[in-house]
């Protein structure tokens, strides 16, 4: 996998996003092995703690699994983020209906929140 780091966004978030996108579009298959923290940090010229933070967040989200010395792999539950997003959207829709907000206004609120 090719990694790109750009100014303007935190590096750990860029790494996290790139892994999620690669899992979603199939560039990273289930059980694909990711580079070691130190190896990826050296490759990108960044601090190992930055890679470790991205990996921790991805593991919390269920996208990857770390198996000690065996390494870090794409989880069989790599689509967990999509499921979490669907659950969040459903909860939001329920709350919006309870408040009597129109669908158009609800979409505008979400778009504004995503831009913030």
Label the predicted regions.
Residues 1-33, 83-116:
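Extreme N-terminal segment that seeds HTH/winged-HTH DNA-binding domains in transcriptional regulators
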Residues 9, 70, 78:
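Short, flexible active-site-adjacent loop segments at beta-strand->alpha-helix junctions, enriched
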Residues 27-32, 57-69, 75-76:
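Beta-hairpin "wing" of winged helix-turn-helix
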Residues 33-64:
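N-terminal helix-turn-helix
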Residues 41-42, 77-78, 115-116:
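Short Asp/Glu-rich motifs
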Residues 43, 47, 68-70, 85-87, ...:
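Short alpha-helix boundary/capping motifs
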Residues 71-72, 110:
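Conserved beta-strand edge residues that scaffold enzyme active sites
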Residues 75-83:
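A surface-exposed regulatory interaction patch that couples sensing to output
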């Amino acid at each position: 996998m090719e990694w790109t780091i750009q100014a303007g966004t935190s590096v750990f978030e860029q790494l996290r996003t790139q892994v999620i996108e690669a899992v979603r579009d199939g560039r990273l298959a289930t059980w694909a092995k990711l580079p070691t923290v130190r190896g990826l940090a050296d490759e990108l010229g960044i601090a190992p703690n930055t890679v470790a933070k991205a990996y921790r967040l991805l593991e919390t989200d269920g996208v990857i699994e770390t198996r000690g010395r065996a390494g870090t792999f794409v989880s069989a539950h790599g689509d967990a983020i999509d499921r979490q997003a669907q659950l969040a959207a459903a909860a939001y829709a329920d709350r919006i209906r309870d408040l009597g907000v129109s669908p158009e206004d609800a979409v505008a609120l979400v778009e504004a929140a995503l831009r913030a």
